Amino acid sequence: MASSNYISSFASSLSGRSGGAIYIHIPFCKQACHYCDFHFSTSMKKKEEMVLAIAKELQMRKNELLDCARSDKNDAEFWEVETIYFGGGTPSVLTTEEIEFLIAEVYHHYNVVENPEITLEANPDDLTRERIVELSKSSINRLSIGIQSFFEADLAMMNRAHNAAEAQKCLELATQYFDNISIDLIYGVPGMSNAQWQQNIETALRFGVPHISSYALTVEPKTALNTLIQKGKIEAPKDEVAEAHFQILVETLEKNGFIHYELSNFGKENYFSKNNSAYWLGKKYIGIGPSAHSYDGISRSWNVANNALYLKAIQQNQLPNEKEILSTADRYNEYIMTGLRTIWGVALDRIEREFGLDYLDYLIKQSEKFVKDELLAIENNILKPTSKGKFLTDGIASDLFYINLEE
């Protein structure tokens, strides 16, 4: 019952406020992981210049909000920041002073709620004892650590910058100074047995981290992993292995008190990610830095994924982004995807209220085969994947998308 109350109150508290999130993309990494297709550079030459440009964009985006408030007479001027998230890339390549400088810039230009969640993504090789102590005295109150695996062979195959010993050592240290810690683990890795995957999870549990994000290894175009597979040097990931690992993950974590609140995310009570949940619950967010995305409820924008072009635009006092106005179908499809992936599901009354009866009828019709196959279920007017359907959620969602609709 306690978990049930927390799940509903968590969503209500986020949805009931008019604020949003700020995401800051730090586009630098020490080396390129083989599977990664996010935007980053392994050259640190422009790091200091980038930090200053990001600070300037924070001011420019606030000015944009103020302009919107004046022209549209909406509440943009009073928009409060509830979470700040440093992602990348590898944000832990910044010095603590640089991180604190950017946080101070957020506070300077925006209204920030009391005790906001402030997350730093970090790699184990950056988290020495000295750095962890330093961060624990900073404004950062949540760490998201890219462990990925506790096995040397997996880390080598992924071309991670840390080794297995560093993965364990950083958690041993981090848990002494931070309560709110999330780690990333990757499953479906070629050659990884069910027993090894179980051991990865058990190792994470031993350190007592309260949040785990876990993703299947995917092969993206233009990555080193894709090239290695095409050359036959690495075996391609198998769906059946990923599904077996997913089931082990869900069963093990739920047995150990974790709530499976989003397809790839598991949290103990009081440790759900407020930042990511803001995205999933349809709240507004501002993305700062190269390749960062923003959403205001009506439109989506994205910054140029090129460090040099980003810096040039900011120097010329131009926001380096493109924008699209979302159609009703776009917003419906997004809600279907995020809703099905979360524990809160898709509320049928919200579909009718926000999108109309045509969309509701379409959703009910498209869902019928999945309900019949026990992959989806409707309870209390909420559409959700069943345990049997969870692993297939993304594919199911795409079949429920509204297409060929003339606005």
Indicate where each model-derived feature is located:
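C-terminal scaffold of the Radical SAM
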Residues: Y6, G19-A21, F40-E64, C68, ...
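Glycine-biased, low-complexity coil/linker segments
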Residues: S15-R17
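A short, conserved structural fragment
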Residues: V371-N381
